[in-house]
């Protein structure tokens, strides 16, 4: 079954939604964005989170020392690097599960995967000057038939109306959603429920 990651949690209500709906992963964004969260705030929220749900820290070009400190303070399960990080940068996090985001415009962008040795790749939409959470999709067909020796996580503009089609085309390990389950900038329980039900209903 395809796994689900809900990204950009920042309120107690978001944690309550997650505890009820049981996504496989939840993401906390530590990069500058409208979903950015402070470490102390994340610590409080994680203390309320069902222990079965894995935690992902999302970073964009964060200094190594800062990212390590946050990861250790919060005991994060996964570190997701969503910026211009290099393999040399990623080598500082050998004790962690690491996902590297690759921003896709066309098939040529897939060549970037050859630069990295990571646990998974997150494929997201390439949008100028933005790093994720844009609500924009890319042409999923560029991923069709692609063979990688690590799992694929599909992101970029997913919502309850297109996630089934996306999964059929890409067959990812997991799908990653943020803006697609929000209303007016906040996580929406009904959209979350519908999204997760659609993913888990696929056979």
Swiss-Prot record:
Superkingdom of the organism of origin: Bacteria
SUPFAM superfamilies: Ribulose-phoshate binding barrel
EC number: 5.3.1.24
Alphabetical GO biological process terms: L-tryptophan biosynthetic process
Keyword annotations: Amino-acid biosynthesis, Aromatic amino acid biosynthesis, Isomerase, Tryptophan biosynthesis
Recorded metabolic or biological pathway in which this protein acts: Amino-acid biosynthesis; L-tryptophan biosynthesis; L-tryptophan from chorismate: step 3/5
Alphabetical list of InterPro entries matching this protein: Aldolase_TIM (IPR013785), PRAI_dom (IPR001240), RibuloseP-bd_barrel (IPR011060), TrpF_fam (IPR044643)
EC supergroup of this enzyme: isomerase
GO molecular function: phosphoribosylanthranilate isomerase activity
Catalytic activity: N-(5-phospho-beta-D-ribosyl)anthranilate = 1-(2-carboxyphenylamino)-1-deoxy-D-ribulose 5-phosphate
Sequence similarity: Belongs to the TrpF family.
Annotated HAMAP family: PRAI (MF_00135)
The protein's name in its UniProt record: N-(5'-phosphoribosyl)anthranilate isomerase
Organism encoding this protein: Thermoanaerobacter pseudethanolicus (strain ATCC 33223 / 39E)
Annotated gene: trpF
């Amino acid at each position: 079954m395809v796994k689900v990651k809900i990204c950009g949690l920042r309120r107690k209500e978001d944690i309550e939604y997650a505890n009820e709906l049981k996504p496989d992963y939840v993401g906390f964004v530590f990069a500058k964005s409208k979903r950015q969260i402070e470490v102390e705030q994340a610590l409080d929220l994680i203390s309320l989170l069902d222990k079965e749900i894995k935690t992902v820290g999302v970073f964009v070009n964060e200094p190594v020392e800062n990212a390590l400190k946050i990861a250790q303070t919060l005991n994060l399960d996964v570190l997701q690097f969503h910026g211009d990080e290099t393999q040399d940068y990623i080598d500082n996090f050998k004790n962690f599960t690491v996902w590297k985001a690759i921003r896709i415009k066309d098939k040529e962008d897939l060549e970037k995967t050859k630069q990295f040795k990571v646990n998974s790749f997150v494929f997201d939409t390439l949008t100028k000057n933005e790093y994720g959470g844009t609500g924009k999709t890319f042409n999923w067909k560029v991923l069709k038939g692609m063979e990688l020796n690590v799992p694929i996580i599909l992101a970029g503009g997913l919502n309850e109306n297109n996630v089934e089609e996306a999964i059929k085309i890409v067959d990812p390990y997991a799908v990653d959603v943020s803006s697609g389950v929000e209303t007016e900038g906040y996580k929406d329980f009904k959209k979350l429920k519908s999204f997760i039900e659609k993913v888990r209903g696929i056979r």
